């Protein structure tokens, strides 16, 4: 597929401090065939004025205007997805910064995929570097690249290895995902699971996004959720609910192996079961011994 038009979705809310830098990083991409669709979620600061300014400055930027009010982070992105018509859609946070070749690298990856892969739900994602509020790199990789390169392992049940602002999905994935299931709490995790069950996940082993950490960004501000994810709380309750809901909704579409994996996962994460029994069952998944031992402690 040559020179595909990309759609970038940005959900904004009170982002006046950093959003100009992110918009500029998108405008300065080496790959130029894109459009940026933004929906503001009721900002109380100067975010909307900044968006209006950029919309006038670049015809590829479109600000959605509706009367739906504040939907919250997740529903804001869902609303944006309903307005995405292009074959390939990327997600942008308002406070990150994209390296200028990010889109170029994604298009290069698309060009190397065969028709069969492109005809199914597809998720392509890269890595990011963790930065402070001045975009100085604190850590070169946000995602464990060794884990992310694992394509045929069932370890994804217990690992968060997809970050929304580094992700791109195709139209097949969007059709599969919306409206969001009731138990979706993180859209990136949702797309990750759907790609594993129904399509393909492709990892670009480069940090093409500067992921800015500060006191007000969506994940960074939610300390309890960040702790559960980054400290690898292996039985994150909401994740279990989502996987169970996917099983119930798509039972007839899931492959036999995936159904078996889900059943094992639900057994291992069933807190009503004996911990030693769950530890024994956990050998089915490719987890290190230390992680399996955490079953006995955190389960």
Model features per residue range: what roles?
Residues 157, 178, 184-185, 197, ...:
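C-terminal subregions of glycosyltransferases and related glycan-biosynthesis enzymes
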């Amino acid at each position: 597929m040559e020179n595909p038009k990309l759609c970038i979705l940005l959900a904004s809310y009170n982002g006046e401090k950093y959003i100009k830098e992110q918009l500029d990083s998108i405008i300065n991409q080496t790959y130029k065939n894109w459009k940026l669709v933004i929906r503001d979620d009721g900002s109380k600061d100067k975010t909307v004025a900044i968006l209006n300014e950029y919309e006038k400055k670049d015809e590829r930027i479109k600000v959605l205007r509706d009367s739906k009010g504040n939907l919250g982070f997740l529903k804001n992105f869902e609303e944006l997805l309903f307005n995405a018509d292009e074959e390939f859609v990327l997600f942008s946070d308002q406070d990150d910064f994209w390296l200028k070749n990010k889109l170029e690298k994604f298009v290069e990856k698309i060009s190397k995929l065969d028709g069969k892969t492109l005809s199914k739900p597809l998720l392509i994602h890269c890595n990011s570097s963790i930065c402070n509020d001045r975009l100085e790199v604190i850590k070169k990789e946000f995602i464990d690249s060794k884990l992310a390169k694992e394509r045929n392992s069932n370890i994804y049940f217990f690992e968060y290895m997809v970050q929304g602002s580094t992700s791109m999905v195709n139209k097949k994935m969007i059709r599969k995902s919306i409206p969001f299931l009731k138990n979706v709490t993180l859209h990136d995790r949702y797309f990750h699971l759907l790609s594993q069950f129904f399509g393909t996940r492709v990892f670009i082993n480069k940090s093409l996004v500067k992921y800015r950490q500060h006191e007000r960004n969506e994940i960074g501000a939610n300390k309890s959720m960040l702790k559960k994810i980054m400290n690898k709380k292996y039985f994150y309750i909401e994740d279990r609910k989502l996987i169970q809901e996917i099983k119930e909704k798509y039972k007839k579409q899931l492959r036999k192996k995936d159904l078996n994996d889900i059943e094992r996962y639900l057994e291992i994460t069933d807190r009503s079961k004996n911990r030693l029994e769950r530890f024994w069952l956990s050998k089915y998944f490719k987890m290190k011994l230390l992680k399996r031992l955490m079953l006995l402690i955190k389960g």
